[in-house]
Amino acid sequence: MADSQPLSGAPEGAEYLRAVLRAPVYEAAQVTPLQKMEKLSSRLDNVILVKREDRQPVHSFKLRGAYAMMAGLTEEQKAHGVITASAGNHAQGVAFSSARLGVKALIVMPTATADIKVDAVRGFGGEVLLHGANFDEAKAKAIELSQQQGFTWVPPFDHPMVIAGQGTLALELLQQDAHLDRVFVPVGGGGLAAGVAVLIKQLMPQIKVIAVEAEDSACLKAALDAGHPVDLPRVGLFAEGVAVKRIGDETFRLCQEYLDDIITVDSDAICAAMKDLFEDVRAVAEPSGALALAGMKKYIALHNIRGERLAHILSGANVNFHGLRYVSERCELGEQREALLAVTIPEEKGSFLKFCQLLGGRSVTEFNYRFADAKNACIFVGVRLSRGLEERKEILQMLNDGGYSVVDLSDDEMAKLHVRYMVGGRPSHPLQERLYSFEFPESPGALLRFLNTLGTYWNISLFHYRSHGTDYGRVLAAFELGDHEPDFETRLNELGYDCHDETNNPAFRFFLAG
């Protein structure tokens, strides 16, 4: 077994290079292929290459960093065992590494973690302790146990040897193609981006390294803007593999020094990238696994890049099968192949026919309507696009010129998640109500807690929930409230669920409000 030497507190680039070269990751990990995406290359007029980390034994890159750190532990540390907290790929990487090294591993996972993930960790040989409502509570428990029982804490990203282990991916990349122009790397806590960037800049500094973050969990961008790591007030949960509130201290130091640029993308763009990967190389990526490709596509469009060799990292494929339904629904929006519109048309015979004729033969993908007013009808309509955003703007202008009142809901998250399934649900009389969107943990008792905290004191006038196959569900709820209800805000804070006031959302006003 090769030696994995400890690094200094803040290693320089050359020290990281030596650590990458010495990291014994191939005792557990595999060299993954770099594959050309033929269809996308033709479509985008660039050579698009994908680094297939979904081919690792644990179906993600996380095995590299976990094994690199654990292989360097002393015999005494190995005898005491290791501990970590994770609800995803890092947990599987630690469990797999522990089995290879013959080291006991305790993985603390939130109680809401899906059974498929718990079973995977146990299948790789890890012992699982379910504790806490979220990752932060699980992590606190893991650190407490490490101090009490002498376990070595294996962090998911913010440790020099973990970073060096992830850097072995970049070494493979350069050996597989030394003529790359840019490499796009997904960012959660920053371990992969830091490892890839520091390695590439030591060997081939002319290659640009671009970080890609999800818009709703962009902790690196927030840190770069502030000049130091900061806590995000909330993180989105769709791309849960990169749902990190705060970038690591060491990963931030390296990213700040070695990255060339950063770009953020929304959930629809990620869904579209997942579809691209499936259609081109038949890979079923998890959302965070397709993040780098989503960023690459956006970056190409923004900077009009042509004729370059561009690589991106498919970082993982531990996708929940039931979540693919949501991806299928959203990828058309991410590719600008569908527009969602709220249109007011006359409540009279032939008005829908006239409206469709005005669309000029374009395919209607969705149409939601229910009688509510004798004079006007508000319809929720989806229209297929062939020329993206430009065509969407043309349709909006054409409808306005035709005398229709129209609101573009294509970028309205609440409309896409909830309202499209609820059109026609106006109350029979006006209500004084406020609307909120919530993120619920998918765990037993979550709904009961919600009702006990809020439903006992205020009437719930609207409620919509739909599972998307993740650890968290999305809920839309309205409450009958007066103008001044300070107790309601107090109860909201007690509930502890992430929520947003949606009362003034145009989709709500058009289709659901009293």
Curated annotation (Swiss-Prot):
<keyword id="KW-0677">Repeat</keyword>
<dbReference type="InterPro" id="IPR038110">
    <property type="entry name" value="TD_ACT-like_sf"/>
</dbReference>
<dbReference type="GO" id="GO:0006566">
    <property type="term" value="P:threonine metabolic process"/>
</dbReference>
<comment type="subunit">
    <text>Homotetramer.</text>
</comment>
<keyword id="KW-0663">Pyridoxal phosphate</keyword>
<dbReference type="GO" id="GO:0009097">
    <property type="term" value="P:isoleucine biosynthetic process"/>
</dbReference>
<dbReference type="InterPro" id="IPR005787">
    <property type="entry name" value="Thr_deHydtase_biosynth"/>
</dbReference>
<keyword id="KW-0412">Isoleucine biosynthesis</keyword>
<dbReference type="GO" id="GO:0030170">
    <property type="term" value="F:pyridoxal phosphate binding"/>
</dbReference>
<keyword id="KW-0456">Lyase</keyword>
<dbReference type="InterPro" id="IPR001926">
    <property type="entry name" value="TrpB-like_PALP"/>
</dbReference>
<comment type="similarity">
    <text>Belongs to the serine/threonine dehydratase family.</text>
</comment>
<keyword id="KW-0021">Allosteric enzyme</keyword>
<feature type="binding site">
    <location>
        <position position="89"/>
    </location>
    <ligand>
        <name>pyridoxal 5'-phosphate</name>
    </ligand>
</feature>
<dbReference type="GO" id="GO:0009082">
    <property type="term" value="P:branched-chain amino acid biosynthetic process"/>
</dbReference>
<dbReference type="InterPro" id="IPR045865">
    <property type="entry name" value="ACT-like_dom_sf"/>
</dbReference>
<feature type="domain" description="ACT-like 1">
    <location>
        <begin position="339"/>
        <end position="411"/>
    </location>
</feature>
<dbReference type="InterPro" id="IPR000634">
    <property type="entry name" value="Ser/Thr_deHydtase_PyrdxlP-BS"/>
</dbReference>
<feature type="binding site">
    <location>
        <position position="315"/>
    </location>
    <ligand>
        <name>pyridoxal 5'-phosphate</name>
    </ligand>
</feature>
<comment type="function">
    <text>Catalyzes the anaerobic formation of alpha-ketobutyrate and ammonia from threonine in a two-step reaction. The first step involved a dehydration of threonine and a production of enamine intermediates (aminocrotonate), which tautomerizes to its imine form (iminobutyrate). Both intermediates are unstable and short-lived. The second step is the nonenzymatic hydrolysis of the enamine/imine intermediates to form 2-ketobutyrate and free ammonia. In the low water environment of the cell, the second step is accelerated by RidA.</text>
</comment>
<protein>
    <recommendedName>
        <fullName>L-threonine dehydratase biosynthetic IlvA</fullName>
        <ecNumber>4.3.1.19</ecNumber>
    </recommendedName>
</protein>
<feature type="binding site">
    <location>
        <begin position="188"/>
        <end position="192"/>
    </location>
    <ligand>
        <name>pyridoxal 5'-phosphate</name>
    </ligand>
</feature>
<keyword id="KW-0100">Branched-chain amino acid biosynthesis</keyword>
<dbReference type="GO" id="GO:0016597">
    <property type="term" value="F:amino acid binding"/>
</dbReference>
<feature type="modified residue" description="N6-(pyridoxal phosphate)lysine">
    <location>
        <position position="62"/>
    </location>
</feature>
<dbReference type="InterPro" id="IPR050147">
    <property type="entry name" value="Ser/Thr_Dehydratase"/>
</dbReference>
<dbReference type="Pfam" id="PF00291">
    <property type="entry name" value="PALP"/>
</dbReference>
<keyword id="KW-0028">Amino-acid biosynthesis</keyword>
<comment type="pathway">
    <text>Amino-acid biosynthesis; L-isoleucine biosynthesis; 2-oxobutanoate from L-threonine: step 1/1.</text>
</comment>
<feature type="domain" description="ACT-like 2">
    <location>
        <begin position="434"/>
        <end position="504"/>
    </location>
</feature>
<dbReference type="InterPro" id="IPR036052">
    <property type="entry name" value="TrpB-like_PALP_sf"/>
</dbReference>
<dbReference type="Pfam" id="PF00585">
    <property type="entry name" value="Thr_dehydrat_C"/>
</dbReference>
<dbReference type="GO" id="GO:0004794">
    <property type="term" value="F:threonine deaminase activity"/>
</dbReference>
<dbReference type="InterPro" id="IPR001721">
    <property type="entry name" value="TD_ACT-like"/>
</dbReference>
